[in-house]
Curated annotation (Swiss-Prot):
Keyword ATP-binding: no
GO BP, sorted A to Z: translation
Subunit structure of this chain's protein: Part of the 50S ribosomal subunit.
Domain of life of the source: Bacteria
Alphabetized Pfam families for the sequence: Ribosomal_L4 (PF00573)
GO molecular function: rRNA binding; structural constituent of ribosome
Listed InterPro entries: Ribosomal_uL4, Ribosomal_uL4-like, Ribosomal_uL4_dom_sf
Sequence segments annotated as region (Disordered): 41-75
Family: Belongs to the universal ribosomal protein uL4 family.
Species assigned in the record: Deinococcus geothermalis (strain DSM 11300 / CIP 105573 / AG-3a)
One Gene Ontology term, aspect cellular component: ribosome
Function: One of the primary rRNA binding proteins, this protein initially binds near the 5'-end of the 23S rRNA. It is important during the early stages of 50S assembly. It makes multiple contacts with different domains of the 23S rRNA in the assembled 50S subunit and ribosome. Forms part of the polypeptide exit tunnel.
Name used for this protein in its record: Large ribosomal subunit protein uL4
Lineage: Bacteria, Thermotogati, Deinococcota, Deinococci, Deinococcales
Annotated keywords: Ribonucleoprotein, Ribosomal protein, RNA-binding, rRNA-binding
């Protein structure tokens, strides 16, 4: 059972979380699944049927002394079609829900074991970048590490979004990949209450989201 101290306006308490042992293989599975879902999959090449070439035979089959050829759209000629080239497709695949939940719990456990997880109940910010920087310094965040801020508080999100070393996500956007690519995790205490039910889910485009069920 991991005990996480809560700071902030309503801090002074702790949250007990039943976090699993970290298994790098599970984390790798979840991150690979997340990144596969983000791939655009728009690479496309033309086959010999799609290139702009005449379908007429280049020259007679016999009598010229040249090698036998049909039309110029074959892959052996410059400007011809591509054999077995890429076509638009989806790289996403399914990953069991329990594995996704376990991966997120392990990512939280990893940051907790390293002492890089901070729970906050009440940031008390006014939406100004200056107030966030001041709050960060008071709590040991000096910009030397990349920080992931997870909160639904609009004023906090507004205050932190222009800070170069901070990334802001809503609670619903909590995911394994973003946790692992930031050195520190600052999370709203509310998001940790149902931590055993958190789940990383795929998202479209370049944003990956999670869901607390």
């Amino acid at each position: 059972m991991a005990q996480i101290n809560v700071i902030g306006q309503n801090g002074g308490r702790s949250i007990d979380l039943d976090l699993p042992e970290v298994n790098p293989h599970v984390l790798h599975e979840v991150v690979t699944w997340q990144l596969a879902g983000r791939r655009r999959g728009t690479a496309s090449t033309k086959t010999r049927a799609e290139v702009s070439r005449s379908g007429k035979k280049m020259y007679s089959q016999k009598g010229t002394g040249n090698a036998r050829h049909g039309d110029r759209s074959v892959p052996t000629f410059v400007g011809g079609g591509v054999a077995f080239g890429p076509k638009p497709r989806s790289y996403s695949y399914t990953l069991p829900r329990k594995v996704r939940q376990l991966g997120l719990a392990m990512a939280l456990a990893d940051r907790q074991q390293q002492g890089k997880l901070t729970a906050v109940d009440g940031f008390g910010l006014d939406g100004k970048t200056k107030s966030f920087v001041s709050w960060a310094k008071e709590n040991g965040l000096d910009g030397s590490e990349r920080v992931l801020i997870v909160t639904d508080d609009e004023l906090t999100r507004r205050a932190a979004r222009n800070v170069a070393w901070a990334t802001v996500l809503p609670v619903a956007g909590l995911n394994v990949y973003d946790i692992l690519r930031h050195e520190r995790l600052v999370i709203d205490a509310v998001a940790l209450e149902p931590a055993q039910e958190l789940e990383t889910v795929p998202a479209e485009g370049n944003v990956q989201e999670g869901a607390a069920l």
